[in-house]
Amino acid sequence: MHELPLVFFTVFTQSAVGAFILLLIGGAMGLVAPRRKAIGLFSVMCLFGLGVIVGTFHVGQPLRALNMLLRVGHSPMSNEIVLSAAFAALGGLGALGLLLNRATPLCNALVWLAAIVGVVFLYAVPQIYQLPTVATWRSSYTTAMMILTPLIGGGALAALFGVRRLGLLVSVLAILVNFCLRPGYMATLMSADSALTAAQHSWFTAQAILLAAGVVGVVVCARLKSSAAVLAMTAVVVIAAELAGRIAFYNLWTLPM
């Protein structure tokens, strides 16, 4: 599918921002050692960077991205590009500085500033898809599902990188909210375009199964204090679930972006 780069861009960047913020909160609460927090912040910034790199394949030509920058403040997509660049710069420099233990006060300020930019970025992404001509996208469910991604994927990643209890709690609560919203979301999609929605049944089913598996993984990790391998597998499973759901989402529009 032509939109596959956007699938990875949105899920990877949203999950990375969610994990980044949770790691900072966990660090402020004393839930994770500074060194481990620094490693986690740098790791999720690498994931964010990977998402951005994959996303550039959708743009096609670098000049096209530059043209988008001319509409900052007027175009949601332009806002997304600027915010992602700002988060990457602030978060990347701050996380690298903390990892290398250089200019710690400045780097701490940079990562918290990056977190603020990240929150704005998370809000800006779903605004791109509130198109009046695409009935399957223009709903509050689109915003809700995209806001849940940084909580589901980001929570699992934060748990993996040291903020175990907080990350697992956030992830499992977000998954449960996803399941609660799912009937209404499916009903809204069916009323907008039943044939197109029915064609995505396998992707939505895969997402639900993987999210359920993620809940099981969270419970196992929480109750048995499992190893990092189980935490890593849980994070992979829930992010894969979000990728499946995002593929279904982009398939709800038949015209290429």
Q: Where does each model-flagged region fall?
A:
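Long, contiguous internal "core" modules enriched in hydrophobic/ aromatic residues
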Residues: 3, 10-12, 31, 38, ...
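Membrane-interface helix-loop junctions at the exits of transmembrane helices
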Residues: 55-59, 186-187, 245, 251
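Composition- and surface-driven signal marking solvent-exposed, interaction-prone regions
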Residues: 231-235, 253-256
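Juxtamembrane boundary at the C-terminal end of a transmembrane helix
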Residues: 240-257
